[in-house]
Amino acid sequence: MIIDVGCGHNPIGDVNVDLFVEATPHRSGDQSKCDDKRLDTKRIPNFVMADACHLPFKDNVFNVVFSSHTIEHVNDPFLMLKEMARISKRRIIIKCPHRFASHRIKPLHVNRLNITWFEHAAKKIRLTVISKKVSSWRSIPHSYIPIVSFPQEITMVFVKSIQK
């Protein structure tokens, strides 16, 4: 079973969580499915209104805990990661803007994260990083400088470490 934490208008989970039902400047994504920026919770399968830092689920419930572009908005990203690990049986997947791209994407991002932050946080809560990827966008070349790539998005995949 998959849970999507911070699902917004594009839920992918069997269970989908978001804190904001009303319109919010934090929301992005495909809003063509709705008349306004409110979440249409009737169209979202198994919708639960909850804070990503305090998820109302038992431990070890979901096979995959997924979150896309939510962790940069929460006040305590470490607590969010810890909660995602708590409710996960095994795998956690997080996507977010890279710290160097974050200010260009939305000024409402309260966290500017990078892979090193995720690696340190994972170690503290006994998660193992099994995949890390930074996608980039390229600037338009100027006649005097070559094409430059800038980090844009991080995708991290973790598994719970086996307890000894």
Where are these regions (language model features)?
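Conserved SAM-binding loop
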Residues: 1-100, 156-160
